[in-house]
């Protein structure tokens, strides 16, 4: 089944929901491997700049939720809601320690008058980081955080779109190595597991996507927005953090490119898409 939406509107957004990082992020956020310690002052500054790009530079209405020290991962709002058009699916995160993060997100999205669907099935798990919406269809990564039942509930929620599942073995989430870099353009990392996942997505889809291959999996996570006053906008990792991948993004001449630093969040597996949920509200005439 082909998606019934409008690909030309892909990437449009009027609002962004973000949440401030708590200091507990440094010691208690979930992470796949114990590496460098998070510099909290730097993490706060990077997050402020990220939010500033969305609000001041791009003109989105930013809904800023407060940090909660009892929820170390709460800055990663992407995992707790999937929004498409006027509907928001409040997820059931795969990590039990993150389940209470959904409460404040649900409240914020209710205030924006979205149709709210809650994932109540105790057998289902879904992290938004495993959900790639292309404008035509959904791909859902089956990972340690997201299961088949979670994918089924997403498919039931967004019935106008095809939903295909992709096994994710070596990464935290599907979007740990891919994202949309444009209306028909998938940014994908170069690792064997990333390329294997791309091949599965290509086989599952009726549509042929263009691909943008970057050397670094983490740098394949970028944010594409279609802002009427700015055109095609792409937030991507900085040349200082990922020099070779940044060179690939710089070839996208029809995009307004905005390099964004994310070194501290990455230490606890957070990437650019993790820290925002975008909503496109219809303007009442």
Swiss-Prot record:
InterPro entries with a match to the protein in the record: DDAH-like
* One Gene Ontology term, aspect cellular component: mitochondrion
In which family does this protein belong, per the annotation? Answer: Belongs to the DDAH family.
> Where, by residue number, does Zn(2+) bind?
274
GO function terms (MF aspect): amino acid binding; dimethylargininase activity; zinc ion binding
Question: In the UniProt record, what gene is named as encoding this protein?
Answer: Ddah1
Report keywords, A-Z. Acetylation, Hydrolase, Metal-binding, Phosphoprotein, S-nitrosylation, Zinc
Q: Phosphoserine (modified residue): where?
A: 33
List of residues that carry S-nitrosocysteine: 222, 274
The phenotype of cells or organisms lacking this gene is: Mutants from some strains grow and develop normally. Mutant tissues do not show any dimethylarginine dimethylaminohydrolase activity. They have higher than normal tissue levels and plasma levels of asymmetric dimethylarginine (ADMA) and N(G)-monomethyl-L-arginine (MMA). They also have decreased nitric oxide porduction and increased blood pressure. They do not show differences in the structure of the kidney, lung or heart. Death at embryonic stages have been shown in other strains.
N-acetylalanine modified-residue sites: 2
What PANTHER family does the database record attribute to this sequence?
DIMETHYLARGININE DIMETHYLAMINOHYDROLASE, N(G),N(G)-DIMETHYLARGININE DIMETHYLAMINOHYDROLASE 1
| Positions annotated to bind substrate | 30, 73, 78-79, 98, 145, 268
**Which reaction is recorded as catalysed by this protein?**
N(omega),N(omega)-dimethyl-L-arginine + H2O = dimethylamine + L-citrulline; N(omega)-methyl-L-arginine + H2O = L-citrulline + methylamine
Q: Could you name the active-site residues? A: 173 (proton donor), 274 (nucleophile)
Where expressed (tissues)? Detected in skeletal muscle, lung, heart, liver, kidney and brain (at protein level).
Q: What is this protein called?
A: N(G),N(G)-dimethylarginine dimethylaminohydrolase 1
Q: How does it assemble?
A: Monomer.
Q: What is its EC number?
A: 3.5.3.18
GO terms of biological process kind: arginine catabolic process; citrulline metabolic process; negative regulation of cell population proliferation; negative regulation of cellular response to hypoxia; negative regulation of vascular permeability; nitric oxide biosynthetic process; positive regulation of angiogenesis; positive regulation of nitric oxide biosynthetic process
State the protein's purpose. Hydrolyzes N(G),N(G)-dimethyl-L-arginine (ADMA) and N(G)-monomethyl-L-arginine (MMA) which act as inhibitors of NOS. Has therefore a role in the regulation of nitric oxide generation.
Q: Say which domain of life the source belongs to.
A: Eukaryota
The residue ranges crossing the membrane are: none
Q: How is its activity regulated?
A: Inhibited by zinc ions.
